Amino acid sequence: AIILKNKNYLFTDGRYTIQSKIESGKNFKILDYFKIINTNVFKNLNLGIDPSLFTSKQIKNFFLKNNKVTIIKENLVDKISKIKSKKKSSFYSIDKSIAGESHHKKVSRVSSFLKRNKYDYLFITAPENVAWLLNIRGYDNPTSPIPNSNLLLTKEKQVFLIVEKNKTTKLLSEKKLKQNQIIDPKYILDFFDKLKKGTIL
């Protein structure tokens, strides 16, 4: 979604167009998702972007052709949201018998893919994919156990979970992750600046 001073745009694919119109009413203009790429609908603006929600490639393709971008480290929607959930509750692991495969094997398979295709890093922005890779769940959404987080995986099988540290208590006690593998979203830009140069998928 793009929230402007006088207009709001919601981008979605054809499956959700009718539902989006019903739920958003007159508050948003509904557009097909593909129109967000270098769109002329909004231009000559300074757009605030949460860097934890987009890759640099997405920011370039979606917003930079006709606009300027300012990086905002705090999620403004979270600051004003009246929806209260168990956002401070720790993520938890699900058993291999439920997941079907250990997270170690999943990490190995994906890292091998990166090596074969000459990528150094995989940046995962979809929380459901983080949930699959690490076999974890959370309490962020009252209707879904998806753990709101991002993740960076290296071709050397290094895992960095990008999430508030208070959500990782159980994962740390299980020794699934170490302290240095937890990256607070507020410092994500500093984290990326310290990475070795390489290609990101």
Spans of model-derived segments:
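A composition/biophysics-driven feature that prefers long, compositionally simple stretches
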Residues: 2-201
